[in-house]
Amino acid sequence: MELETLISWLLFSTSLFWFLFLATKTKSKPPKTPSSTTNTPIPKSYPIFGSAFSLLANFHRRIQWTSDILQTIPSSTFVLHRPFGARQVFTAQPAVVQHILRTNFTCYGKGLTFYQSINDFLGDGIFNADGESWKFQRQISSHEFNTRSLRKFVETVVDVELSDRLVPVLSQASNSQTTLDFQDILQRLTFDNICMIAFGYDPEYLLPSLPEIPFAKAFDESSQLSIERLNALIPLLWKVKRFLNIGVERQLKEAVAEVRGLATKIVKNKKKELKEKALQSESESVDLLSRFLSSGHSDESFVTDMVISIILAGRDTTSAALTWFFWLLSKHSHVENEILKEITGKSETVGYDEVKDMVYTHAALCESMRLYPPLPVDTKVAVHDDVLPDGTLVKKGWRVTYHIYAMGRSEKIWGPDWAEFRPERWLSRDEVGKWSFVGIDYYSYPVFQAGPRVCIGKEMAFLQMKRVVAGIMGRFRVVPAMVEGIEPEYTAHFTSVMKGGFPVKIEKRSPLV
């Protein structure tokens, strides 16, 4: 710890000395892009250190800070100067999003910085892959995600988790009038679900005792510390710590070892299980790992990387979306009533066809994710020089970030009522009062990405979320137990979270008829 502190102070002191010296000698020049006007709040930039001072001052609210800048710029695009000459383009313009995600897709990849930051945790999984590796994983994943048998398996997994675990936990909280952290409950629920769907492995995270599970804890630490690497202003610092195996880098190494150790063990056991089933002519398992192995992809490292990426993508995004959804629902009783009308008369285990009919619920989930997207930003790296549709020059190696959070709050996209939680903006209603979903193009609403990298698990995510919403709302009312009038803080790790959790009371609802 003393060595780590010494190294950190040496790097910080050297950086601070040069920053103060250069700041007194040189004033910044605004970047030569269409975003640069004398009235925009683009932060000052200094030689070597760029806009590090502004970045550090706003790091705790960097999502909101960069969103605020984008809202005041006519082009909805600006260039941020990072330390040591690096540049990062931020945009909230649909035409630019379409350009980087579809029109000029081959120019923009994950990049070396992302790969190095995440590789220890995700390996070469689809979430961390580019080029031919990504294409191959995308192809086999798309095939498996679109099978009817997987959809039925997802339905079964979610139904069992709801009836056997979530409902008893909420009933117990209602009877005892205890306060629950609903964000934690949803994270446990979705972790159990996605582990079963991906691995056929039940971590038993959502039990009445709300146990601490080493695998879940290690998974959280691995994702959080990996994203801290990615957000580091001075990447050299974490690389030095990793080399010396000290501080958070030692913690990350231990967490990753726990995750990958158990994952590898599960893969080995699954291969053995599949061989035994084949010998006994038993029906095959339908979880994703079994599907990958049965289709000839037997390399343990490859399938482990793929499945860990799927768990990461499916766990935190779904719980984040549901957390903010239930908070917004508590503030808008008319939306709650419309959803209750929609689920009234449906079976306790809502079937696939019934889920498809939950049009208003679908719109409410989309509207919630517009204001509070599970993934607030997404960043690509330019493979070669490019010019964006608004004229912004992008050099090879520059980061280009499309700001999903800012786009969901853009008056240019959503109109003057953008701040209102209004599911009806996604709907049309016929003369007999039946809702139909209208939607919006992916490039104005890139919550599930767009183009070739559009989320392959989107339909599975909506299936899971709508079944959970119906399962909870048909039995309980979720009542926030936080200070009245204070909005929870939206903050981002790998995905968004409600800072400090979501304390709630659970009230039993009269049976819907």
Curated annotation (Swiss-Prot):
Cell compartment(s), UniProt: Endoplasmic reticulum membrane
Class in the EC hierarchy, top level: oxidoreductase
Enzyme Commission designation: 1.14.-.-
Keywords tagged on the record: Endoplasmic reticulum, Heme, Iron, Membrane, Metal-binding, Monooxygenase, Oxidoreductase, Transmembrane, Transmembrane helix
Tissue: Weakly expressed in seedlings.
Record field: transmembrane: 7-24
UniProt-listed InterPro entries: Cyt_P450 (IPR001128), Cyt_P450_E_grp-I (IPR002401), Cyt_P450_sf (IPR036396)
Topology relative to the membrane: Single-pass membrane protein
Binding site for heme: 455
Protein role: Catalyzes the omega-hydroxylation of various fatty acids (FA). The substrate specificity is higher for myristate > laurate = palmitate (C14>C16=C12).
UniProt name for this protein: Cytochrome P450 94A2
Originating species: Vicia sativa
Gene: CYP94A2
